């Protein structure tokens, strides 16, 4: 088994918005395939017409593309085991079901949930124990009688009367005792296949060697192993894949991260201005680490080092502050022209316009690259370049534009009006001479009113560079307006 070419799969259901737990699962599968030189198969589990949507399907594709996780087989790529959407594979499942029924691996079960509970109660058992395998040995006459009543059976797999064990690549040896897992349904009463059937059937037919998935699905593993063995006996499967159950992702209060938690929504992170490198780096840390002494690494470095055997089995908590810090590191690591291009695209997407030309925008971007945590932070720092977006923050004004700042603004205006070459060095020299030497002010007292007047805020990109980019006329006009208000 372990000598086979690694084939892993990512098989989300197209429901709702992609969440970080789903993406973490995709990342670990993708990284393991790339690390081993194997195949990353992307499959869509869209057998629930009531919940599935084309919008969610498109969102999953969008998420994978944005993150740069390419797939070797799947929708829009194709592959030897097409189709890769379960809704298009119904005939395949019906054929497998027929073969399982013919071989006696599954049987028709007519019991209703109410009848199962009643039998448990009559025997003094907990009525919520689940199915009791009652229909296993129905006679032909009993089945006919149920059918004559108009009942339509589900099909259930005969679970073996033995322990079901596997060596989980994350959790180690795992065993479910004989009799602890009842016979389970693989079809609905209308004959439609259930997830419990189609997932292992697709894995078998697509020759998936390793199943990496969330630990919440671990209780279904003994059922799937039993089904794989049945599929092997009828010639559908060649082997039982290896399993690795990834740790849960926790949210605030150490509760499992829910789809209702804002930080679980992948696209909210993108909208804030996370870059793929930062988000993927952080998601990789939810159960794995490249080394004890550093948490920041590239995707290539992750691929080179990733082994599913190194994944930690303990739950991992989503820490937004740490995610932000790692994203900030990745932003700082970008080449300046790369950061500029991404920031421009982000601004265009969100309708932000600095009104700067390309050259000036690149200079402005360079001023904030080391000052932002997410791309969205940059708009608050750069919007003052747009006269329509510029406004003086009242808290900053209350602190810096007091009556006593009039002398500072007067001196600044007088010095700057005499500047001939409107460049950063000239602006800096004029203001320092007038304010630090002339008025004998400390830098914070000297430049605080200037900064608020020019940028509208107490926190801004470097002041002198900002004034050069803003230009002489607009800088002086804002200083005069600020002087008038004090």
Curated annotation (Swiss-Prot):
Biological processes annotated in GO: glutamyl-tRNA aminoacylation
Carries keyword Cytoplasm? Answer: yes
- Catalytic activity annotation: tRNA(Glu) + L-glutamate + ATP = L-glutamyl-tRNA(Glu) + AMP + diphosphate
Residue positions of motif 'HIGH' region: 12-22
Return the Pfam families for the record: Anticodon_2, tRNA-synt_1c
Q: What class of enzyme is it?
A: ligase
By sequence similarity, the record places it as follows: Belongs to the class-I aminoacyl-tRNA synthetase family. Glutamate--tRNA ligase type 1 subfamily.
Q: What protein am I looking at?
A: Glutamate--tRNA ligase
Species, as recorded = Mycolicibacterium smegmatis (strain ATCC 700084 / mc(2)155)
Tell me the name of the encoding gene. Answer: gltX
């Amino acid at each position: 088994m372990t000598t086979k070419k690694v084939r892993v799969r990512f098989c989300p259901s197209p429901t709702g918005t992609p969440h970080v737990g789903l993406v973490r699962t995709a990342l670990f599968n993708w990284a393991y395939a790339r690390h081993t030189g194997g195949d990353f198969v992307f499959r869509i589990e869209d057998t629930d017409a009531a919940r599935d949507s084309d919008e969610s399907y498109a969102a999953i594709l969008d998420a994978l593309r944005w993150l740069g996780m390419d797939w070797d087989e799947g929708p829009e790529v194709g592959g030897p085991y097409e189709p890769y959407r379960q809704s298009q594979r119904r005939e395949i499942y019906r054929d497998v079901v027929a073969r399982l029924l013919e071989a006696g691996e599954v049987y028709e079960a007519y019991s209703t949930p109410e009848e199962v509970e009643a039998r448990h109660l009559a025997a003094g058992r907990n009525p919520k124990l689940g199915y009791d395998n009652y229909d296993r040995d129905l006679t032909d006459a009993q089945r006919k009688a149920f059918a004559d009543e108009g009942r339509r059976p589900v099909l259930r797999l005969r679970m073996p009367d033995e322990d079901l064990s596997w060596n989980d690549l994350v959790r180690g040896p795992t065993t479910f005792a004989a009799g602890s897992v009842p016979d389970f349904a693989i079809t609905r009463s209308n004959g439609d296949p259930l997830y419990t059937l189609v997932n292992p059937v697709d894995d078998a037919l697509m020759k998936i060697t390793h199943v990496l998935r969330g630990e919440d699905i671990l209780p279904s593993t003994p059922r799937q192993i039993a089904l794989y063995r049945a599929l092997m006996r009828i010639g559908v499967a060649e082997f039982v894949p290896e399993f690795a159950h990834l740790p849960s992702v926790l949210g605030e209060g150490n509760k499992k991260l829910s789809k209702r938690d804002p930080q679980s929504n992948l696209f909210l992170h993108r909208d804030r201005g996370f870059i793929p490198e930062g988000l993927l780096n952080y998601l990789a840390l939810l159960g794995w680490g490249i080394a004890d002494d550093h948490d920041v690494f590239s995707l290539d470095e992750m691929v080179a080092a990733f082994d599913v055997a190194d994944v930690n089995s303990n739950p991992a908590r989503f820490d937004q502050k740490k995610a932000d810090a790692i994203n900030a590191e990745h932003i700082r690591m970008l080449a300046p022209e790369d950061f500029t291009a991404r920031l421009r695209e982000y601004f265009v997407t969100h309708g932000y316009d600095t009104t700067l030309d390309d050259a000036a925008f690149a200079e402005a971007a360079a001023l904030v690259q080391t000052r932002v945590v997410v791309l969205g932070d940059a708009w608050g720092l750069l919007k003052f370049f747009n006269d329509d977006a510029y406004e003086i923050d009242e808290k900053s004004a209350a602190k810096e534009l007091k009556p006593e700042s009039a002398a500072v603004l007067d001196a600044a205006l007088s010095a700057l009006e005499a500047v001939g070459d409107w460049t950063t060095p000239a602006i800096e020299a004029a203001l320092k001479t007038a304010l630090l030497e002339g008025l004998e002010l400390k830098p914070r007292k000297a430049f605080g009113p200037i900064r608020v007047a020019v940028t509208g805020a107490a926190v801004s990109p470097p002041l002198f560079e900002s004034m050069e980019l803003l230009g002489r006329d607009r800088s002086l006009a804002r200083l005069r307006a600020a002087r008038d208000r004090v």
